[in-house]
From Swiss-Prot:
The keyword Signal does not apply. Belongs to the perilipin family. It is found in: Membrane; Lipid droplet. This is Perilipin-2. Residues 412-437 are annotated as: Disordered. Milk lipid globules. SUPFAM superfamilies: Mannose-6-phosphate receptor binding protein 1 (Tip47), C-terminal domain.
Amino acid sequence: MASVAVDPQPSVVTRVVNLPLVSSTYDLMSSAYLSTKDQYPYLKSVCEMAENGVKTITSVAMTSALPIIQKLEPQIAVANTYACKGLDRIEERLPILNQPSTQIVANAKGAVTGAKDAVTTTVTGAKDSVASTITGVMDKTKGAVTGSVEKTKSVVSGSINTVLGSRMMQLVSSGVENALTKSELLVEQYLPLTEEELEKEAKKVEGFDLVQKPSYYVRLGSLSTKLHSRAYQQALSRVKEAKQKSQQTISQLHSTVHLIEFARKNVYSANQKIQDAQDKLYLSWVEWKRSIGYDDTDESHCAEHIESRTLAIARNLTQQLQTTCHTLLSNIQGVPQNIQDQAKHMGVMAGDIYSVFRNAASFKEVSDSLLTSSKGQLQKMKESLDDVMDYLVNNTPLNWLVGPFYPQLTESQNAQDQGAEMDKSSQETQRSEHKTH
């Protein structure tokens, strides 16, 4: 004998929500909410941010509570069965629950209109009596509808309160509390207090009164605001740091290029000028060696060594500049495309400057035209840095405020990997130059 499949018992919450009276009322409220959002753009952006926050915390809560719900599934099924039986009896006593709100109002209006027409056609001389009859019918109809709605609200409210008061919901609430607390701790750990928040904390006076713990919604809103603000400040500080490093490298490259030009222009004019150029280049070499951790001041002071060392400085600085440009690009994801194109073009120009010095063994192999174009590219890079920084200071990228903070994580990670590889090659170049000289 073939077994008969038994449909699973529907959830009481699902049945209550699917009642025509409840669902139609919800549709009316939803349409009013959407209409209000469309009419007021500023209110729409705030509502969308709140919806995203609620979706996030709901997802975290459901993930945390899922193991608990699975353990209590038999008890939940029994409670759901009793609740469904009670809802069946309520639906039998109140057929109005299975009618949408628009139909209830239309039926009431139809009954009133029919009564009015019948009285008007049969009793033309008793207007006052007809009016009082119509008023009584309307009051009774309105009272019946109101009473049905109140009973429905009472049933739904009682069912919700019963569910919320159950041990299962208490465990779910505890899971939400733990998830929210852990999220707050993670924000404090990975996104430290900003200077403004530190000043506010310093101005607070510690008291002995107990502070009431805020609700979930207040804590969720505070956490969202705190996360956006601190993430923006951290991203901005990274960009400022990249700009500062780039400007320092550009300044050092300017000085190195000027020294090379000076040596090239005066190498055949007079021995004294040659000696002056060599002295300046040697001092630049010593200063750069000290900046990277070496203090070998007893090295040879001959012209050939000075030239090779100066070219090594130029190669190292251009590699640093390329790395810094990749770091800057990885930290400005989400800004307009023209700003990202400027940052990418800076990396291209840094690569062009590096190609000028990469294979040069002496100053003779670096032409005046290449030095002139390198100086022009360095000046353009400095201007592009100023433009990017001015934009970020005066125009906060929207995704830095409402998330995600790194919408192109793959590109960002690739840029950082390229920067790390260039750092490694730069260090190897430094070691090889040190061993050679």
